């Protein structure tokens, strides 16, 4: 809901993990681009995509903080990896009026899910909720 995904959107989802989030997003938008640094994990997710008939997800090797500049710009970016602050490389890959949702905060055990919207004058941030340690890994 916080991502406000539309059927014509191009979404970057990081990291791929099991492919669950990318599969859900694939039902809501035009294209999902996802990156995963672990080759075994990525290949397992790609196999799941094929077995489910998901054809609008593109998976590639790579780290979350770099995004996917070759495929940018994106209408939406969803990260399940937390950061102290939003990586500048990802903010640069947002379309105007694009939205990034990411767990942020200096304490890796307690992060706040934050929505960042690219505006004409920069970026607006909205803290949505703070996750306790037991929930953080389940995003």
Can you annotate each of these PLM segments?
Residues 2-123:
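Conserved nucleotide-cofactor-binding alpha/beta core module
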Residues 119, 125-138:
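Conserved histidine-centered catalytic loops in small-molecule metabolism enzymes
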